[in-house]
């Protein structure tokens, strides 16, 4: 059962803090060298922070460290005001989450506006050696829900990597915009920008290296992490936003359909908010004055859609496009504050705003399956039974409209569009029952909303040659805590009608397969309850191995950001994603390299005619479709068998793992002998 992380009560948590916490009085004695105490001298201020130490694993935790002033009163909707470390600080308990609807009782609002805090998990205290690389994590939740308290950082600390998790304003309080300079929107993103500045200033006091900071996020957090790296706002020194040296985007990028809202959405949402709160919608100044005088509970949208009445609303929910969210602010005209999102992300990538910042991004293999087989299964099975050609005519039309949000990166091809809707409809027509139809809906929505945006992102990110990009597919469905624990209330992670879906499986019908949205999180973070305690549960040998490999992948990415030679080109892989090979990392019980990520499906979504005309795609879909004649020749790259991969992080400080079992070799895509059977894997995890 998912623990309710959101029932945080500051007073109760403070009462439960260890007695050793220092709150004031006479200066304490100098602590022991391994005590969880940090002394700071910065910006003309002195501070002493006391945290917690885990004696078993040897890492240090500092919770609830405020990086900005509470955004209340006239500061509501405005950009954050920095808070500097000063005085005696108790860092032994979490802040409350930012205001949001309670996922278990949507009519109830939880949290507090004084929520702009971060947590730090450090493997060691500062010393003479080089500081540890830093992973700055942004939680998901479709820009309207989430908290840092669920994400324990102990696994990354065992790879000599610091984890920082930051809270930021959500929903209307974080992304409301009138289009005027006093409420231009994206306050939640600017919160994260301020938290990143805090990390640059202070992380060295916690044993971190500010020149090796990876911004990582999941879902909408992955989109936010990508937007941070594409931002021109606040660039200084080496010209990288907020010291961003690398981006790890999990199941969400700046090209995801829900990454930024459509042009008219913020204005429409502002009017809806005015109507709902009883405030005047015009002029904008009166609306702002009215909203700033209201309790935050009146502003947070507690209405959650429970009954799906049409396909459009279904797609809005699972694509993360409903409600308030990030927006394009427009270019800087020197009449207001500089924007963080100045243009469409696709334009930023074309203009190489990412500069030399490397990107690691990926997806789970069944992103939408839990939503399709759970919360929305009845709606979808009813549609499959009652609407002729539902997948082809209704669903696919809606998905193609959503994918247009990727914007300008779909290759333009002459001639008729490829038979994209026919492909998924043919899969359904060749199936036996409606549950198989759900499988095709899960495949189609997963391709459109996650796989294709990730694929387009890695292509565009590295197109200019300055930045490297890497793609992974997380395909292990283990027994660790599922995504609903980390993402309560998010439709993609919602267990929904799990009992009903399980009954369908018992009846001999197919069910969801593969990890769904958020299921990879327990393989990076220790799932924690509201008091910061591990949820526990059995961890199999395979679960432990996959967790070690996935944590190792992220840690190695951070460790190879090149602090000494001042470059951000990592030597993590000898084979980044490229136009020729399209290599990607496949994470299952073991880790392998593969080529041609969903090669034919990406060809259909990208309207790449010459790809579909090739022999490989004819083998994949030829039995389903009578493909039109295409005259463009194509050479299909061949996936050779790959050698075994060594342990991901065998020689990093603090690693306590054993080498993984032998890896099953990857099957060739064709029987044609490749020209070069060696893919140079010696450098893939060199020195790990």
Give the ranges of each region predicted by the language model.
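Non-catalytic accessory segments of hydrolases
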Residues: 2, 14-189, 210, 368, ...
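Short Gly/aromatic-enriched secondary-structure transition segments
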Residues: 57, 61-67, 71-84, 373-395, ...
């Amino acid at each position: 059962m998912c623990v309710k992380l959101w029932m945080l009560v500051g007073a109760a948590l403070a009462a439960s803090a260890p007695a050793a916490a220092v709150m004031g009085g006479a200066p304490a004695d100098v602590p022991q060298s391994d005590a969880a105490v940090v002394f700071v001298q910065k910006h003309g201020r002195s501070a002493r922070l006391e945290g917690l130490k885990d004696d078993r694993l040897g890492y240090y935790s500092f919770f609830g460290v405020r990086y900005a002033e509470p955004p209340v009163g006239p500061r509501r909707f405005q950009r954050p005001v920095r808070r500097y470390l000063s005085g005696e600080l108790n860092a032994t308990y979490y802040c409350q989450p930012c205001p949001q609807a309670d996922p278990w009782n949507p009519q109830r609002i939880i949290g507090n506006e004084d929520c702009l805090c971060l947590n730090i998990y450090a493997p060691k205290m500062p010393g003479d050696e080089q500081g540890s690389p830093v992973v700055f994590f942004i939680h998901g939740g479709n820009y309207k829900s989430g908290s840092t308290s669920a994400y324990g950082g102990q696994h990354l600390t065992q790879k000599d990597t610091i984890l920082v998790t930051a809270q930021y304003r959500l929903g209307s309080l974080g992304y409301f915009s009138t289009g005027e300079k006093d409420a231009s929107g994206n306050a939640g993103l600017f919160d994260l920008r301020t938290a990143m500045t805090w990390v640059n200033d202070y992380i060295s006091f916690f044993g971190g290296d500010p020149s090796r900071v990876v911004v990582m996020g999941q879902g909408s957090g992955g989109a936010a992490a990508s937007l941070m790296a594409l931002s021109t706002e606040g660039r200084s020194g080496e010209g990288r936003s907020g010291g961003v040296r690398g981006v790890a985007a999990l199941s969400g990028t700046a090209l995801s359909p829900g990454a930024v809202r459509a042009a008219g959405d913020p204005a429409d949402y502002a009017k809806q908010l005015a109507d709902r709160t009883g405030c005047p919608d015009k002029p904008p100044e009166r609306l702002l004055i009215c909203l700033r005088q209201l309790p935050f509970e009146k502003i947070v949208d507690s209405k959650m859609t429970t009954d799906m009445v049409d396909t459009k609303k279904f797609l809005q929910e699972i694509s993360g496009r409903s409600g308030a969210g990030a927006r394009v602010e427009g270019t800087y005209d020197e009449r207001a504050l500089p924007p963080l999102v100045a243009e469409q992300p696709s334009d930023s990538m074309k203009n190489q705003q990412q500069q030399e910042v490397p990107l690691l991004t990926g997806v789970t293999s069944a992103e939408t399956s839990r939503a399709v087989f759970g919360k929305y299964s009845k709606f979808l099975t009813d549609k499959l039974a009652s609407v002729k050609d539902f997948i082809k005519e209704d669903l696919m039309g809606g998905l193609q409209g959503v994918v247009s949000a990727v914007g300008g990166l779909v290759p333009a091809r002459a001639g008729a569009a490829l038979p994209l809707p026919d492909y998924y409809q043919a899969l359904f027509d060749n199936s036996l029952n409606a549950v198989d139809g759900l499988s095709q809906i899960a495949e189609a929505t997963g391709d459109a909303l996650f796989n294709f945006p990730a694929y387009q992102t890695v292509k565009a990110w590295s197109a200019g040659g300055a930045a490297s990009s890497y793609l992974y597919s997380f395909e292990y469905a283990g027994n660790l805590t599922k995504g609903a624990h980390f993402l309560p209330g998010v439709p993609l992670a919602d267990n929904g009608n799990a009992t009903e879906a399980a009954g369908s499986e018992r009846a001999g019908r197919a069910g969801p397969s593969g990890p769904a949205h958020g299921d990879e999180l327990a393989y990076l973070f220790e799932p924690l309850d509201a008091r910061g305690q591990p949820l526990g549960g059995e961890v199999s040998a395979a679960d432990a191995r996959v967790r070690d490999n996935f944590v190792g992948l992220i840690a190695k990415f951070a460790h190879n950001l090149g602090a000494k030679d001042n470059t951000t080109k990592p030597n993590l892989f000898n084979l980044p994603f490229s136009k020729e090979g399209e290599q990607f990392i496949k994470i299952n019980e073991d880790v392998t390299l593969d080529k041609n990520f969903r090669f034919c499906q990406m060809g259909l979504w990208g309207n790449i005619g010459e790809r579909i005309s090739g022999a490989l795609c004819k083998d994949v879909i030829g039995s389903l479709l009578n493909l039109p004649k295409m005259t463009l020749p194509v050479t299909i790259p061949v996936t050779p068998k790959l050698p075994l991969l060594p342990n991901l992080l065998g020689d990093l400080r603090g690693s306590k793992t054993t080498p993984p079992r032998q890896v099953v070799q990857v099957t060739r895509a064709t029987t044609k002998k490749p020209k070069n059977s060696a893919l140079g894997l010696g450098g893939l995890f060199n020195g790990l």
